[in-house]
Amino acid sequence: MEMMTRRSFLKITGAMALAVGAAGALSGCDAVDNALGSFFQQYGDQKGHAADSAGSFMYALSNQYQPWSYGEELVLLAVEFQVKNLTNETVTFKASDITSAKIDGHKAKVVLDPKKAANVSGLGKYTPLFDANGTKTYGPGKDLNKAEAGYICFQPEGEAHVSKNWSSLEFTFNLKGKTSTFVMTRNADGSVTSARKE
């Protein structure tokens, strides 16, 4: 399984922008934005990465994750979410825009304070996506060399007993007026693949 590093994310989206950029003079911005988004989704499908877009606002799972457990039980799962904003708009993503989440079929919630929620002393190099208020703002930009990444932290809810050897995460969210569902599957060797659910 090929990992989508930040560098490959930038290369892919940059190459796609150049490939469809020439069409802009002939067909208008909306057509170019839609073509760029469509190519990005197709690339994600081919490489085993959940990827989607709202025009030229593109987002994906990098297939990087970090679990925390107590004994045999999963207490927190952080997954890296990447965004490239090639629009002229500021887009705000809120934790509350994640309308549902499940780990191994059990309800899960987005956690803003891992220390308080799961007694995790810090995410270390895993930068949280959302701030303490549960928001992330993506500024406008046309920089092909800039993508933003951060970790969304999920925790099983209630009495759910999810194994530290979890097998699937599914979450649905609204971003820039579009609803998407991403599914991440953990393989026996610990590697993961992800996909956009139709």
Each language-model region and where it sits:
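Bacterial signal peptide processing site
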Residues: 30-31
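Short, solvent-exposed beta-strand/turn "edge" segments of beta-rich domains on protein surfaces
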Residues: 63-78, 90, 141-143
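The feature marks short-to-medium sequence segments in extracytoplasmic or secretory-pathway proteins
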Residues: 84-148
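Short, well-ordered beta-strand segments enriched in hydrophobic/aromatic residues
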Residues: 77-85
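Surface-exposed edge beta-strand/loop patches
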Residues: 142-198
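Low-complexity, acidic Ser/Thr/Pro/Gly-rich terminal tails and inter-domain linkers that flank the onset
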Residues: 38-72
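Glycine-centered tight beta-turn/hairpin loop motif at sheet-sheet or coil-to-beta transitions
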Residues: 54, 107, 175-179
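N-terminal secretory signal peptides and thylakoid transit peptides that target proteins
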Residues: 1-20, 24-27
